[in-house]
């Protein structure tokens, strides 16, 4: 009986989400936006602690669009993105997310997306 009560109370405590998992979900979400052609939303996923000049914002948007076009030319586009792994350093509020990009020509590429936690949200570095 006491054992059962211990199990009950241990299952009631609040579970804290794994920071690496959360960073991985965020990184995949940003790259999914890129696949959908939502370049502004993708660029908004970068940690920008200070307001950037409009000309720099425009350049980041152009770079994102050119990157997608280049992948279309070289690999028949990006088809999907998968999270392979994520390692978080909770002391420094950073994480490295390992993504797999699957291309239209059936090739796959692994990339690392460095992330930083800012006000309880994961942003790309």
For the regions a language model picked out, list residue spans one by one.
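Short beta-strand element of the conserved SAM-dependent methyltransferase core
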Residues: 1-2, 99-101, 115
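Short, low-complexity N-terminal intrinsically disordered segments enriched in polar/charged residues
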Residues: 10-36
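Sec-dependent bacterial lipoprotein signal peptides
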Residues: 1-10
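Stable alpha-helical elements in mature extracytoplasmic
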Residues: 23-27, 38, 42, 60-64
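Short, well-ordered alpha-helical segments enriched in acidic and aromatic residues
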Residues: 36-51
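Short beta-strand edge/turn micro-motifs at domain boundaries
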Residues: 108-125
């Amino acid at each position: 009986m006491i054992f059962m009560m211990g199990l009950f109370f241990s299952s009631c405590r609040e579970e804290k989400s794994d920071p690496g998992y959360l960073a991985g979900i965020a990184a995949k979400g940003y790259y999914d936006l890129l696949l959908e052609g939502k370049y502004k939303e993708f660029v908004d996923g970068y940690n920008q602690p200070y307001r950037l000049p409009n000309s720099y914002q425009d350049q980041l948007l152009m770079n994102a669009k050119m990157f997608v076009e280049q992948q279309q030319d070289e690999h028949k586009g990006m088809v999907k993105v998968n999270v392979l792994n994520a390692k978080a350093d909770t002391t420094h509020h950073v994480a490295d997310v390992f993504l797999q990009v699957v291309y239209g020509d059936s090739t796959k590429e692994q990339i690392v997306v460095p992330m930083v936690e800012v006000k309880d949200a994961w942003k790309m570095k």
